[in-house]
From Swiss-Prot:
PROSITE patterns: COMPLEX1_20K. It catalyses: a quinone + NADH + 5 H(+)(in) = a quinol + NAD(+) + 4 H(+)(out). One of its GO terms (biological process) is aerobic respiration. Keywords: 4Fe-4S, Cell inner membrane, Cell membrane, Iron, Iron-sulfur, Membrane, Metal-binding, NAD, Quinone, Translocase, Transport, Ubiquinone. This is NADH-quinone oxidoreductase subunit B. Its cofactor is [4Fe-4S] cluster. The keyword Metal-binding applies. Its EC number is 7.1.1.-. The lineage of its organism: Bacteria, Pseudomonadati, Pseudomonadota, Alphaproteobacteria, Hyphomicrobiales. NDH-1 shuttles electrons from NADH, via FMN and iron-sulfur (Fe-S) centers, to quinones in the respiratory chain. The immediate electron acceptor for the enzyme in this species is believed to be ubiquinone. Couples the redox reaction to proton translocation (for every two electrons transferred, four hydrogen ions are translocated across the cytoplasmic membrane), and thus conserves the redox energy in a proton gradient. It comes from the Bacteria. Binds 1 [4Fe-4S] cluster.
Length: 195
């Protein structure tokens, strides 16, 4: 009795997942977001969506955030890593810009010195409203390792208002990406008038 080889029709390569799968739930990340759940249920029922202008503007704003780098130290390396293909922050609607007049978000990454503080404030003032600030890393959050130095500002929130703090020394690219997602959630919850 000879053994005959059997050929399976299953692919040799695992199929690529659609979106980033959350290991805890087995569903794509953001699938439990109440905003997207309500939109998909309304579209499934009627085929069109009824919303207010305020909600529409907030939805568009969260999907088209333009960020400006203010890399002052080693945290800037992780900030650059976030925009590379592995994490690809642009798929979340978060794209880099080179000019403060075209950007909505400033990421302060690194140690802010007393000499650099006026330049940071000047760049912040050039950004159009509504503008947001993400403080990235221990040095930007509170001075970090150089907290007791005479030339270091003990947190960039003493110079500009900060919306999201990302802790770490340096924080990973995943932590910064999570901070971006938190900022988008904060924008969705805040109206267009108040800020």
């Amino acid at each position: 009795m000879a053994l005959t080889p059997t050929f399976s029709r299953a692919p040799d390569i695992a199929p690529a997942p659609k979106g980033i799968i959350d290991p805890a739930t087995g569903r794509p990340i953001g699938a439990n977001d109440p905003t997207f759940l309500s939109i998909s249920s309304e579209l499934a029922d009627r085929g069109f969506l009824v919303t207010s202008a305020d909600e529409l503007i907030n939805w568009a704003r969260t999907g088209s955030l333009m960020w400006m780098t203010f890399g002052l130290a080693c945290c800037a390396v992780e900030m650059m890593q976030m925009s590379m293909p592995r994490y690809d922050c642009e798929r979340f609607g978060f794209a880099p810009r080179g000019s403060p007049r075209q950007s909505d978000v400033m990421i302060v990454a690194g140690t802010l010195t007393n000499k650099m503080a006026p330049a940071l404030r000047k760049v912040y003032d050039q950004m159009p409203e509504p503008r947001y600030v993400i403080s990235m890393g221990s040095c930007a959050n509170g001075g970090g390792y150089y907290h007791y130095s005479y030339s270091v500002v003990r947190g960039c929130d003493r110079v500009v208002p900060v919306d999201i703090y990302v802790p770490g020394c340096p924080p990973s690219a995943e932590a910064l990406l999570y901070g971006v997602l938190l900022l988008q959630r904060k924008i969705r919850r805040t109206g267009t008038i108040e800020r």
